[in-house]
Amino acid sequence: MVGINWLRPEGYLRLRPMYAKTSNPGVKSNQISVEHLGLVEYKKAWEYQREIQAGVIAGESPNTLILLEHPSVYTAGRRTQLDERPKDGTPVIDVDRGGKITWHGEGQIVGYPIVKLRNRNDVVGFVREIENALIAACSEFSVKTERYCERSGVWIRDTKSERKIAAIGIRVAKGVTMHGFALNINPDMSAYDRISPCGFTDTGVTSLAQELGRDITVSEVSPVVERHVLLALDRISE
């Protein structure tokens, strides 16, 4: 793991960055703290999200955007069906977000916005803002993406095929979000072969590297994603 301290306050583990929380210099965001955590095991990051969400609900923590990568892991949202899981017994973590099964791994930017919504009932509006932010980020690398009616996430749709480049799954409690998005930059795409990502059997998956036909790194893309997501969160969070 990169840049992580494990502390034990009041009898439980807490995940804390070793460096200051930062904001993208291109964005003025007085309300949103940004934490870059590097590579973090999924369950530990999930526990950390819950801790921050509880703090935001209680008014004790600021709105927060976590950006990180995960070691290879499959996670299943609440709508995942038994026949959508890997057939070879590969372990899957069941989580409390919406959506179905997906994969996380290195080469993927994962973002967890934990914010108090200005309109606590506008969950769809929140998802649309995140989608628009990722669409704008991809466009800066000359990759044209779009929303797909009634299918969350960010897609590429052309004469070749329909393929997903970013997945979104969230949970909202007392008007505060958690979980978030995953944008494929240059991951090992073979990990998707074991599942039907997000439950879709009639579409594919892709990455920025595949669409560009060249290597591209998480470190190149992360500041652009951060900038656009912060702009979106400023519009919809308290």
Where are these regions (language model features)?
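Anionic group-transfer/hydrolysis microenvironments
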Residues: 71-72, 171, 182
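Two-metal-ion RNase H-like nuclease active-site motif
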Residues: 168
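Conserved phosphate/anionic-ligand binding catalytic regions in large, soluble enzymes, centered on
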Residues: 176-184
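Short, low-complexity Ser/Thr-rich regulatory SLiMs
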Residues: 157-158, 172-174
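N-terminal lobe of the biotin/lipoate ligase/transferase fold
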Residues: 2-7, 11-165, 190, 194, ...
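C-terminal accessory segment of soluble enzyme catalytic cores
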Residues: 155, 190-238
